[in-house]
Amino acid sequence: MKLQKSKLHKNDQVLIISGKFKGRSGQIIAIDYKNETVKVRDINKVTKHVKPTQQKTEGGIETFEAGIHISNVALKFKTPKLKSKDKATSDTSITPLSAKEHTKIGYKIENNKKVRIAKRTGKSI
């Protein structure tokens, strides 16, 4: 399996876009490129029963974040909402494309440096 570099980085604010935790957001604390997963702070917490060892004399129950597949998260990037003059056209079930909170990531070269940009707005991150 070929290891691919992710466009997401550690400490990025991300939004879960699919799966059990859809709609929740948090900060990336670790990225596992081999398994293509990310660990997001306070999301997908699991408990594990741990036996006492020579290094850890205390046994018990530990909680920690488990990985979420990298395709289920997107960079959180708030864009300005559209102002609608016509109330009949502003239906609550239909959200305009610019009102979404997440974006894809692209790259652009500025001043001989590779910079991450938000595809939705074109601004650098």
Swiss-Prot record:
One MF term in the entry's GO annotations:
structural constituent of ribosome
Q: Does the keyword rRNA-binding apply?
A: yes
Q: Name one GO biological process term.
A: translation
Q: Which PROSITE patterns match?
A: RIBOSOMAL_L24 (PS01108)
Per the record, what is one GO cellular component? ribonucleoprotein complex
Which Pfam families does UniProt cross-reference here?
A: KOW, ribosomal_L24
Q: Write the record's keywords in alphabetical order, separated by commas.
A: Ribonucleoprotein, Ribosomal protein, RNA-binding, rRNA-binding
The annotated subunit structure for this chain is: Part of the 50S ribosomal subunit.
Family, similarity comment: Belongs to the universal ribosomal protein uL24 family.
| Its job | One of two assembly initiator proteins, it binds directly to the 5'-end of the 23S rRNA, where it nucleates assembly of the 50S subunit.
Listed name of the protein: Large ribosomal subunit protein uL24
Protein's organism: Mycoplasma mobile (strain ATCC 43663 / 163K / NCTC 11711) (Mesomycoplasma mobile)
